[in-house]
Amino acid sequence: MRIAIDGPAGAGKSTVARILAKKLSFTYLDTGAMYRAVTVLFLENNLSLEDENGIKRLLEKTDIKIIPGDEGQKILLNERDVTELIRTPQVSELVAKVSALPEVRKYLTELQRKIIAKGNVVADGRDIGTVVMPEAEVKIFLTASAEERARRRHRELLAKGYEVSYEEVFREVLKRDELDTTREISPLRKAEDAILVDTTGLKIEEVVAKLLEIIGRKNDVL
């Protein structure tokens, strides 16, 4: 079975998808982490978003691996562990623009489909149900109010030791929403056959329970 979970930043996709995959003994594919890993390369190489040839050369020698583990997945970028680095504010600020680049989306979509082809998978991102895995048996679109999503992100950053105000995070969430929904290539949108789940005010375990119920109903039909 293939389960696609899409939604805007801060909706809880990664946390919920990771828990679901563990409960179902499925592979977990965090596509957002892959885009963040590529963004690290842009920052470290001072690569311009307009440098098409430079981007192609960079991607040709880029290797991204997702290594599952009991404490969560590790992201290896050219054999280097960047699991923590990809969650920094600098990466968060640039990732939407990097994600909108056609060369980057093509490269990562192909890589994601290779992982998906291996078997039972829970994949989360912004275009899983519409582009990467449109044939998924279960499609979920997670959302929440912008205020709720900003609060979650703010708590996460504070817990990691970053000094940032809620107002800054809220503005960043709104900016990310605009970039994700208006980009020319694979914009964020709900697939026609996806089930909408609003996570505003819900605890993680409540969201997971809702999704397990949806998956169970779908499984009965298949």
Swiss-Prot record:
GO terms for molecular function: ATP binding; CMP kinase activity; dCMP kinase activity. It is found in: Cytoplasm. It is an enzyme of class 2 (transferase). Its EC number is 2.7.4.25. One of its GO terms (biological process) is pyrimidine nucleotide metabolic process. ATP binds at residues 7-15. InterPro entries: Cytidylate_kin, Cytidylate_kinase_dom, P-loop_NTPase. Keywords: ATP-binding, Cytoplasm, Kinase, Nucleotide-binding, Transferase. It catalyses: CMP + ATP = CDP + ADP; dCMP + ATP = dCDP + ADP. GO terms for cellular component: cytosol. NCBIfam families: cmk (TIGR00017). HAMAP family: Cytidyl_kinase_type1 (MF_00238). Belongs to the cytidylate kinase family. Type 1 subfamily. This is Cytidylate kinase.
